Amino acid sequence: MQEMQARAQALISESALRSNLTALARQAGTQLLLPVKADAYGHGMEIVARLAARHPAVWGFAVAVPREAATLAALGLGKPILLLTPPTLEEMGPLADLGVRLPVASLAEAEALPAHARAHLKVDTGMNRLGARPEEAVRVGQRLAERGLLEGAYTHFATADEPDLSFARQQFARFQEVLAALPPVLAHAANGGGVLSFGPLPSLSLARPGLASYGFAPAHLRGVAPLTPVMTLQARVTHVHAVYPGESVSYGGLWRATRKTIVATVGIGYADGYPRNATGKACVLVRGECRPVLGRICMDQCMVDVTDLEVRVGDWVEVWGTDKITVTDVAAWGGTVEYEVLTGLGARVERVAAG
């Protein structure tokens, strides 16, 4: 059977990824534990991991769920993998067999770990999501050390991407108190906001910049390190036709032509992760020009005004990229954040490694 063409492609730039990793490692003063959870923030876990594994600053990878860990381990990239959220007791053995580092936050978990496991102590310093409170974390960490299983310890900053860093500093002080009561371990706390806000932090061996690795920073931290969006999203024109005065486009008739308009139907919609809430605000790049999306964004398609442009079926239009239209723009149009737009990118969008 002939291979079918993708209607939409996410081009993943190796050069942008490498540049971002270099800049963040320099800013942090440590190696990186690169988060590739949620399909590498929508960029494609396998593509990103294969590209990043060749970078000298990447110590290993962090994932959110056991299935991600198993998939990543099967690639055989030779880099450590840390599971960030707790597995069930039944999952501990198989994950340890794969060499996956396991999070531990209780004495019960510390006792249940198989003898060949490697553990990272999860400390809750104020996020109140996962982990042991500092006083309990010390006891858990000491027990893991007694068993010879303690490789690392980590916490997570709740507000490091905000201008006010006072709470993040409190969190880090609590984490340092825990580290002082343990033998030397691989310690990590700084997410992207932490890396950009604080730079090198004492006692830390690794940094975990997530969204920043893919080229995005909070508005007040842009420019601290040179970051470039790694993904360019493009979609094919599937139909070109004329619409005449008084005629409407898409569901609900929200947009109505006041003049003859040439409309291109483009093969991407909200089922692919293009936010429906961006209706009435979104535009795409057609031959380098920002052109408005007309009417409601549909499940599989959207319609674009291409009047006075030379456009044919099969042409690519840029949905977002590095210059005129970014994920930040699309997130603003959709009333959300870059994380949600990127991780919502659907499986129908083909991920392609690019230069």
Curated annotation (Swiss-Prot):
GO molecular function: alanine racemase activity; pyridoxal phosphate binding
GO cellular component terms, semicolon-separated: cytosol
GO biological process: D-alanine biosynthetic process
Positions of modified residues (N6-(pyridoxal phosphate)lysine): K37
Cited PROSITE patterns: ALANINE_RACEMASE (PS00395)
Domain of life where this protein originates: Bacteria
Keywords recorded for this protein, A-Z: Isomerase, Pyridoxal phosphate
Binding of substrate, residues: R129, M299
Active site: K37, Y251
Pfam families for the chain: Ala_racemase_C, Ala_racemase_N
EC annotation from Swiss-Prot or TrEMBL: 5.1.1.1
Pathway where this protein functions: Amino-acid biosynthesis; D-alanine biosynthesis; D-alanine from L-alanine: step 1/1
Catalytic activity: L-alanine = D-alanine
Requisite cofactors: pyridoxal 5'-phosphate
Enzyme class name: isomerase
Gene3D superfamilies registered for this protein in UniProt: Alanine racemase, Lyase, Ornithine Decarboxylase, Chain A, domain 1
Presence of the UniProt keyword DNA-binding in the record: no
Function (record text): Catalyzes the interconversion of L-alanine and D-alanine. May also act on other amino acids.
NCBIfam families: alr (TIGR00492)
Family statement: Belongs to the alanine racemase family.
Protein name: Alanine racemase
Organism expressing this protein natively: Deinococcus geothermalis (strain DSM 11300 / CIP 105573 / AG-3a)
Originating gene: alr
